[in-house]
């Protein structure tokens, strides 16, 4: 099946960050086979031609760190620092989860993400009360591209920890698929919730199965102080001593990194999932993304969960990411629009090991989203496309979402998830949680 999308303004995010006015994209099954400017002559003998009527077409956004199973917890635990938020709000509520509630919560997060332009994401879920196979089936049904990872903790007894490691290894062996729509990573929660032995076992699993690692690291000053007091090392050095960086690793946050740590992480191919809104809301601080990029680190933007954000809008994350860097450095050139877009598309895709997506180029997967600026005053005049995408647009502006060549959202309607049912069930399950 060959389909051509014509009469579009195409934000390619190729090496030149080329924007093609009045262009077209030809998709064959799940791949892009041509991207050009001008009128379409049907040289490829396509099956269908779709007039985009001047819509902006850009790569699907890539969320490098989130927790979709937590989506029912939106608005619970506002105005709290990370540790009391986790210990007195999030973990007690997660302990009440059931498989049915977890699926309902996941569906809500998936619906919000895909309708706001996210096509790929990397996720960590707490396995308490969760049917991991049901979660993977739910993500698959959404049509999204994802790395969904089972989180490990050292809570409970040593036998509990051993069982958690065994279950996580089975999960990795079952779901790791480097080139598929769904895959997984090895995901120890953090250095303050995992024992040294557990972190070492996670490193072993990652090396033996050739997977990536996903971990919360250097998120707060308190974490750095506590880990240094307990182990005599800062979190980066401690994680390295456990062997975690033997495989490409995504660290969520990286708010508290010094110059030497940034250089070390760049050298060891450790990438950062930057969560600006979540870090601000939890009072964790502001990650120095400008310095990370200058050190050669790979960085991708992320939302974290709705419980700490409180939405999954990647456009909002792009905007706050660039504004924060300009503000803390007092440098208006810090993180310009092209870089912000890169960190939410092809750069983010590279961070989570999904190089097959993130730009609109021949050979890439057909993952793209559209915005119709014609009826949106906040996107007019419509000639400064890149600027408007970062500084003016929002996830609410999305018209269409194509993932792997399939129309997942069309004219604002999600084709893979039942929006009315999901919203109804989210409210019903939320009422059953005891605060």
From Swiss-Prot:
Binding site for substrate: 94, 150, 189, 219, 304
Co-factor binding comment: Binds 1 zinc ion per subunit.
Cofactor(s), by name: Zn(2+)
GO MF: 5'-methylthioadenosine deaminase activity; metal ion binding; S-adenosylhomocysteine deaminase activity
SUPFAM superfamilies, alphabetized: Composite domain of metallo-dependent hydrolases, Metallo-dependent hydrolases
Pfam families (alphabetical): Amidohydro_1
Keyword entries, A-Z: Hydrolase, Metal-binding, Zinc
Residues given in the record as Zn(2+) binding sites: 65, 67, 216, 304
Enzyme class: hydrolase
Protein's job: Catalyzes the deamination of 5-methylthioadenosine and S-adenosyl-L-homocysteine into 5-methylthioinosine and S-inosyl-L-homocysteine, respectively. Is also able to deaminate adenosine.
Sequence similarity: Belongs to the metallo-dependent hydrolases superfamily. MTA/SAH deaminase family.
Designated name of the protein: 5-methylthioadenosine/S-adenosylhomocysteine deaminase
Species, as recorded: Bacillus cereus (strain ATCC 10987 / NRS 248)
Gene: mtaD
């Amino acid at each position: 099946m060959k389909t051509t999308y014509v009469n579009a303004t195409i934000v390619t995010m190729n090496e030149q960050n080329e924007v093609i006015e009045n262009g077209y994209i030809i998709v064959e099954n799940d791949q892009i086979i041509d991207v050009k400017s001008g009128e379409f002559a049907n040289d490829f003998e396509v099956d269908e031609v779709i007039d985009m009527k001047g819509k902006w077409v850009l790569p699907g956004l890539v969320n490098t760190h989130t927790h979709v199973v937590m989506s029912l917890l939106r608005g619970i635990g506002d105005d709290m620092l990370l540790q009391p938020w986790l210990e007195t709000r999030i973990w007690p509520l997660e302990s009440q989860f059931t498989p049915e509630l977890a699926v309902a919560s996941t569906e809500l997060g998936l619906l919000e993400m895909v309708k706001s332009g996210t096509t790929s994401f990397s996720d960590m879920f707490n396995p308490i009360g969760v049917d991991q196979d049901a979660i993977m089936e739910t993500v698959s049904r959404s049509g999204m591209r994802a790395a969904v990872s089972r989180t490990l903790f050292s809570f409970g007894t040593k036998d509990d920890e051993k069982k958690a490691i065994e279950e996580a290894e089975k999960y990795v062996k079952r779901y790791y698929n480097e080139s598929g729509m769904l895959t997984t990573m090895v995901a120890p929660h953090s250095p303050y919730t995992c024992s040294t032995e557990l972190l070492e076992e996670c490193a072993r699993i990652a090396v033996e199965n050739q997977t990536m690692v996903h971990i919360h690291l250097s998120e707060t000053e308190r974490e750095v102080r506590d880990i240094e007091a307990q182990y005599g090392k800062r979190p980066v050095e401690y994680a390295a001593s456990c062997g975690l960086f033997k495989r490409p690793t995504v660290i969520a946050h990286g708010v508290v990194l010094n110059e030497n740590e940034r250089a070390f992480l760049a050298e060891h191919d450790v990438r950062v999932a930057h969560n600006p809104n979540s870090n601000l809301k939890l009072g964790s601080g502001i990650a120095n993304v400008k310095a990370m990029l200058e050190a050669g680190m790979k960085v991708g933007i992320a939302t974290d969960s709705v419980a700490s954000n409180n939405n999954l809008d990647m456009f909002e994350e792009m905007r706050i990411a660039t504004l924060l860097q300009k503000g803390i450095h007092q440098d208006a050139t810090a993180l310009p629009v092209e870089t912000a877009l890169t960190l939410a598309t092809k750069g983010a895709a590279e961070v989570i090991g999904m190089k097959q997506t993130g730009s609109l180029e021949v050979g890439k997967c057909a993952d793209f989203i559209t915005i119709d600026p014609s009826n949106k005053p906040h996107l007019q005049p419509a000639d400064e496309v890149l600027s408007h995408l970062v500084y003016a647009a929002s996830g609410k502006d999305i018209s269409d979402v194509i993932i792997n060549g399939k129309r997942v959202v069309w004219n604002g309607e999600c084709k893979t998830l039942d929006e009315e049912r999901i919203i109804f069930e989210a409210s019903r399950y939320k009422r059953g949680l005891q605060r």
